[in-house]
């Protein structure tokens, strides 16, 4: 399938349909994100990505799941300021750096440090946020590090809790620590972006409470098996059903569970062997949760190999041992490995035009086929790397469009020509408001040469673009040995966001 067709196929249509440049940007977004999440023996992974309709452009949310050589799993979610091609390109670069660091054995804190160094030389990555988790599925050990990103939510049998401590975004000079925790079987970890918290009309702190409540409720309704994908779908539907959403929303969930068993079969060299193998494999693949296309491909390939063994392995050894052995397992790194062994003699395909077609089909259906030919018998080994597709969605039918804010953005000084005057900011500081706020701050601080105070107590939304502007203004002031005082009382929208990203505000106004 051509790459563009594949990426367009990952886009789940909006309620109104997307066409033209917006569709092209969405296709770009799909091309820069992973096509799916791995299927693993001890941890179920699910993801959802909901594209924003406000700004009608591809955004900077991103995620990744990296299976490491020792079977550990790296989980990453990040958010780049802004929308459009620049944001998508930046998140693609950050994703590549994070993946390389994880595959090279980097710890979560090490990955954050590498991203921070990279972001210093890439303007569009300044104040990007990211959370990195490494999970050992065997022991349940968790390591977490974050740069200005909302903390991951761990759901356990005793209740929910958020992990880690807040620190500043990338390229802001913040120190990034690493926390440790542990997951038991059945526990579920959720990484996400702020789009699920900062829904229209919802205070960010309330958004965090809503997420914990919804996630706890939905986890209790899971039917006992691993259901990370359904969990993501249900959390998204429950939280945006009544409020709608403004920004991209990304969810990445991992649920630890008991290991998936193997399939071991010893079959007679009769046609019933094929039927028995297919039935056992069908049950195992259903427990694995692969999609229908993958299940069909694996079933077909195994059926062809078992048929070959039954029909040809023992034709010149009548009366001897005539058993076909089938072994199926999912490795710690997410590879389905199947071995079909017999004690007969390998017979290369004849010149007959229809001989050897079964093996040829098997080679085309799975990732890798190897044949071990020994005097004691033949073993055919099949390997296939399944994953669970992740759909990039626009607004699902029935979801309300984010309403326009009742209060417009406004920023004004309390008095003109007064160095003690405070810049008071009202309303939502979204991407458009951030541009105006940048101009205001440059003007009143003389590009950082005059100390000023900014009252953010009346802000109803402080988007990542606004955080970027505030960091820029703070750094300009610091460079000139001046101060930019950010005023936000505890409990306010701005206080919640500023604490999260490491721009600790003054609480007394």
Positions of PLM-derived features:
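Conserved beta-strand-loop-beta-strand hairpin that lines the nucleotide-binding pocket
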Residues: 68-73, 86, 133, 259-261, ...
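Helix-loop-beta hinge of the Bergerat
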Residues: 43-44, 58, 146-151, 260-294, ...
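Conserved ATP-binding N-box helix of the HATPase_c
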Residues: 105, 292-320, 471
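Conserved beta-strand-loop-short alpha-helix elements that form
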Residues: 71-84, 144-147, 180-202, 254
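Flexible, glycine-/charge-rich segments associated with ATP-binding catalytic modules
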Residues: 233-272, 364-421, 431-435, 443
């Amino acid at each position: 399938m051509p790459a563009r067709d594949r990426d367009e196929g990952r886009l789940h249509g909006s309620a109104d349909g997307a066409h033209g440049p917006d569709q092209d940007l969405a296709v770009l977004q799909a091309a820069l994100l992973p096509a799916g999440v791995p299927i693993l023996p001890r941890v179920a992974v699910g993801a959802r990505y909901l594209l924003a309709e406000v700004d009608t452009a591809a955004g900077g949310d991103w995620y990744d799941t990296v299976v490491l050589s020792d079977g550990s799993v790296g989980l990453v979610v990040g958010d780049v300021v802004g929308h459009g091609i620049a944001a998508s390109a930046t998140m693609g670069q950050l994703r590549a750096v994070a993946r390389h660091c994880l595959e090279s054995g980097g710890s979560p804190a090490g990955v954050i440090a590498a991203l921070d160094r990279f972001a210093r030389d890439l303007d569009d990555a300044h104040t990007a946020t990211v959370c990195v988790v490494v999970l050992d599925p065997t022991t349940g050990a968790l390591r977490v590090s974050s740069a200005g990103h909302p903390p991951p939510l761990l759901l356990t049998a005793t209740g929910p809790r958020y992990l880690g401590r807040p620190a500043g975004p990338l390229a802001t000079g913040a120190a990034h620590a690493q926390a440790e925790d542990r997951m038991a079987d059945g526990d579920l970890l959720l990484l996400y972006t702020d789009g699920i918290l900062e829904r229209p009309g919802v205070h960010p702190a309330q958004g965090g409470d809503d997420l914990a409540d919804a996630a706890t409720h939905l986890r209790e309704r899971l039917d006992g098996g691993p259901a990370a994908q359904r969990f993501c779908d249900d959390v998204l539907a429950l939280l945006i059903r009544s409020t709608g959403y403004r920004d991209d929303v990304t969810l990445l969930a991992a649920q630890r569970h008991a290991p998936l068993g193997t399939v071991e079969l010893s079959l007679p060299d009769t046609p019933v062997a094929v039927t028995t193998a297919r039935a056992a494999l069908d049950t195992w693949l259903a427990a694995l949760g692969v999609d229908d296309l993958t299940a069909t491909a694996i079933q077909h390939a195994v059926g062809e190999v078992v048929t070959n063994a039954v029909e040809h392995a023992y034709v010149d050894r009548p009366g001897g041992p005539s058993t076909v052995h089938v072994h199926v397992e999912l490795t710690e790194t997410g590879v389905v490995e199947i071995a079909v062994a017999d004690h007969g003699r390998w017979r290369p395909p004849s010149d007959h035009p229809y001989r050897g077609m079964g093996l040829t089909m098997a080679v085309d259906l799975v990732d890798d086929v190897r044949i071990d030919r020994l005097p004691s018998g033949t073993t055919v080994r099949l390997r296939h790397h399944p994953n669970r597709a992740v759909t990039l969605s626009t607004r699902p039918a029935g979801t309300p469009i984010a309403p326009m804010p009742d209060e417009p953005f406004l920023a004004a000084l309390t008095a003109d020509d007064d160095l003690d005057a405070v810049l008071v900011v009202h309303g939502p500081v979204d991407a458009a408001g951030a541009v105006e706020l940048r101009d205001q701050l440059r003007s009143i601080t003389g590009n950082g040469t005059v100390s000023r105070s900014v009252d953010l107590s009346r802000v109803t939304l402080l988007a990542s673009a606004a955080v970027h502007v505030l960091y820029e203004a703070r750094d300009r002031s610091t460079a000139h040995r001046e101060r930019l005082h950010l005023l936000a009382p505890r409990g306010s929208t701005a206080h919640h966001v500023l604490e999260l990203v490491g721009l600790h505000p003054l609480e007394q106004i």
